[in-house]
């Protein structure tokens, strides 16, 4: 099997204003080579809270465009990583993952416990879904992100994952403790339970694939067959740069986040 080239984004914890907070990288697995294409060092990054605006996160593609999410802005790049455009919305805050289906790009708006939809043809945010809970029942409320009647900033469930395909929309967060599915009538159901603090949970191959971040493993849980857990690599302390820096915004080793299915 030929090894792929992948595009990855990074978040650099502990950076100070004016320093690099991450970037976009082209990773050639066959040649064992990494090339940085974009350096994220903007000076207007929000420094409140752990991580927050820092770095670049979700990635999606259209035929001739590369879409990358920052905390409160969606960027469009050419295949040669030239900036084409950027798009903001007052209800987009602390975005993590994005997912495309046809001409719609779905984004997690973590700060608002919401999912937003961006129309790739019209180049505007056209739809929003706010998640809350009434007792044990999940509640989804639609809103128009172009108006003023949207939700308040809450971040109760820390929605950090959305996946859209022919089977529908699934999403989850650090504090949902379940993979959630959105039905056509806007009802929300639980697909399965999830460990607290996981990332990137998605249906896959009749089961669920996720970063079980608290356990430092990538985990596949089958409905009927065997389950698999693969440890996230841990490197010798002596090989690490800036080791010993004690800051609550520094990510620890083995912290698994980000999944790309290639076959």
Give residue ranges: language-model regions.
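Beta-rich catalytic cores
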Residues: 20, 55, 94, 111, ...
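Short loop/turn segments that connect beta-strands within beta-propeller blades
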Residues: 29-31, 78-82, 119-123, 182-186, ...
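Loop/turn-rich, solvent-exposed surfaces of beta-rich toroidal or solenoidal domains
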Residues: 202-263
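Short coil/turn segments that connect the beta-strands within blades of beta-propeller domains
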Residues: 2-6, 63-64, 102-104, 166-169, ...
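Blade-loop segments of beta-propeller domains
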Residues: 36-99
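Surface-exposed loop and turn segments in beta-propeller and other repeat-based domains
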Residues: 34-52, 88-91, 125-155, 228-252
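Conserved beta-strand positions in repeat-built beta-propeller and related beta-rich domains
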Residues: 8-19, 28, 67-71, 107-112, ...
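Conserved beta-strand position repeated once per blade in WD40 beta-propeller domains
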Residues: 57-58, 97, 161, 199-200, ...
């Amino acid at each position: 099997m030929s090894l792929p080239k992948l595009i990855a984004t990074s978040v650099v914890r502990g950076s100070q204003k004016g320093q690099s907070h991450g970037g976009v990288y082209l990773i050639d697995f066959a040649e064992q080579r990494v090339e940085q294409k974009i350096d994220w060092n903007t000076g207007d990054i929000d420094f409140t809270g752990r991580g927050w605006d820092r770095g670049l996160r979700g990635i999606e593609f259209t035929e001739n465009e590369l879409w990358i999410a920052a905390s409160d802005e969606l960027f469009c790049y050419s295949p040669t990583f030239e900036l084409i455009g950027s798009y903001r919305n007052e209800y987009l805050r602390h975005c993590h993952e994005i997912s495309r289906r046809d001409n719609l790009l779905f984004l997690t708006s973590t700060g608002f416990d919401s999912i937003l939809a961006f129309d790739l043809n019209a180049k505007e945010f056209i739809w929003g879904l706010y998640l809350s809970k009434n007792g044990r029942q999940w509640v989804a409320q639609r809103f128009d992100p172009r108006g003023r009647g949207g939700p308040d900033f809450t971040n109760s469930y820390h929605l950090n994952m959305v996946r859209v395909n022919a089977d529908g929309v699934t999403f989850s967060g650090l504090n949902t403790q379940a993979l959630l599915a959105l039905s056509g009538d806007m009802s929300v159901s639980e697909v399965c339970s999830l460990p607290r603090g996981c990332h990137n949970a998605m249906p896959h191959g009749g089961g669920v694939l996720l970063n079980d971040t608290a356990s430092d493993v990538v985990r596949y849980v089958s409905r009927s067959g065997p389950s698999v857990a693969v440890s996230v690599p841990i490197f010798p302390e002596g090989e690490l740069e800036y080791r010993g820096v004690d800051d609550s915004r520094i990510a620890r080793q083995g912290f698994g986040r980000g999944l790309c299915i290639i076959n």
